[in-house]
Amino acid sequence: MSQLMQLKDVAESTRLGPLSGEVSAGEILHLVGPNGAGKSTLLARMAGLTSGEGSIRFGGAPLEAWATATLAQHRAYLAQQQNPPFAMPVWHYLTLHQPDKTRTGQLNEVADMLGLGDKLGRSVNQLSGGEWQRVRLAAVVLQIHPDANPVGQLLLLDEPMNSLDVAQQNALDRVLHHLCQAGIAIVMSSHDLNHTLRHAHKAWLLKRGKLIACGRREEVLTPSYLAQAYGLRFRRLDVEGHPMLISAT
């Protein structure tokens, strides 16, 4: 897989770094670590929303050299929290994120995949927390979806599984896998280590802004590295052919 983004000595005040790493096209990378590890700070920096020490190159060019409108065509970003805007139907909110607003079929398809087919006529400010989270996810998927956006490359998600039940998480995993197969790089923060073991290609483990380990998921999510990050003892078990992490304390 070709490198899409390169980070070198990236740092922000006392919250992050310096850290270096690469993101490749078509891979799913999970950022894991305890609260306050710097995951949200790093994602916002990778999205081009903040600045600081070090350098980030995206698509062969310095991230700060990208015009805002052009960058939005190549990468989509889901913040951890966002309140609904003024009252508008769900379908209207989603249309605002589509590069090609005539592709109503694609909007309906993504909405159906995330269980929103019967919510399109509802106002966004009348949704439950889980419904609003899925609407936000559908919006960034539509923004970057390769069927309508041939230059889409990167999807950044800050705790996308928040407020989703097990079935909704599974539906999102299927959508992300489809995007990954199409060559989109996905970087997301996660607090579910076993989900990372099942679905990520690579993982970056952070603690207090420092990168403890990075690489393939099974190389990073080891009991020794996790003990450094969380201050707990972990065991890795095999359950019906699948690895599972449990706290041993």
From Swiss-Prot:
Annotated ranges, domain ABC transporter: 1-233
A UniProt-annotated Pfam family: ABC_tran
Subcellular locations according to the entry: Cell inner membrane
Coiled coil: none
InterPro entries, alphabetized: AAA+_ATPase, ABC_transporter-like_ATP-bd, ABC_transporter-like_CS, ABC_transptr_BtuD, Metal_Ion_Import_ABC, P-loop_NTPase
One cellular-component annotation, GO: ATP-binding cassette (ABC) transporter complex
An MF annotation (GO) of this entry: ATP binding
Highest taxon, organism lineage: Bacteria
CDD domains for the chain: ABC_Iron-Siderophores_B12_Hemin
Amino acids binding ATP: G33, P34, N35, G36, A37, G38, K39, S40
Keywords in alphabetical order: ATP-binding, Cell inner membrane, Cell membrane, Membrane, Nucleotide-binding, Translocase, Transport
Family annotation (PROSITE patterns): ABC_TRANSPORTER_1, ABC_TRANSPORTER_2
Family: Belongs to the ABC transporter superfamily. Vitamin B12 importer (TC 3.A.1.13.1) family.
Record's subunit section: The complex is composed of two ATP-binding proteins (BtuD), two transmembrane proteins (BtuC) and a solute-binding protein (BtuF).
Name of the protein: Vitamin B12 import ATP-binding protein BtuD
Protein encoded by which gene: btuD
